[in-house]
Amino acid sequence: MNSTLVIMGVSGSGKSTIGKLLAERLSLRFFDGDDFHSENNVQKMSLGRPLTDHDREDWLASLAELIVAEKPIVLACSALKKKYREHLSQSDISLRFIFLDIPYEVARKRLASREDHFMPVSLLDSQFETLQRPQNAINIQAEKSASAIVDELENFLS
């Protein structure tokens, strides 16, 4: 696998879970974009306030640097807007975006049951409002089990 894989989607779509499992199957390193948010961004989201494009600038720059430094990897990153995906794609590194497409109610249920995460359920509406569905991504229906999704991706990528 020569391409870096960016697992994208709204909060609760399964990016971290799928990313970890897929990285393990493909023997690649996994990174979670959530780990690269500044303390200010985490605090803002924890308070139920959505991030702005300006809030995301340094975060996206850090992820773009990571993509260049650690290639190939599996990266979980919301990448909700086209311009965020373009920012991550600025280098000559081959990227493949995998969009975990999930119905609102399924994502809401997952977020409500999630513990120890800074993203409150109240921000899910803003995630869906911000989402610009990717045109050139592998589109996966994410309400399936994690193992079924990873099997599907492994078959697709091989």
Regions found by a protein language model. Name each.
Residues 4:
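Walker A (P-loop) ATP-phosphate-binding motif of ABC ATPase nucleotide-binding domains
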Residues 7:
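Hydrophobic anchor at the beta1->P-loop junction of P-loop NTPases
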Residues 10:
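P-loop (Walker A) phosphate-binding loop of NTP-binding proteins
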Residues 15:
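Conserved lysine of the Walker
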Residues 20, 24-62:
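Conserved substrate/cofactor phosphate-moiety recognition/catalytic segment
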Residues 70-73:
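Loop/turn-to-beta-strand initiation segments
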Residues 92-110:
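Conserved phosphate-donor/acceptor-positioning beta-strand/loop module used by diverse small-molecule
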Residues 113-152:
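Small-molecule kinase domains that catalyze NTP-dependent phosphoryl transfer to phosphate-bearing small molecules
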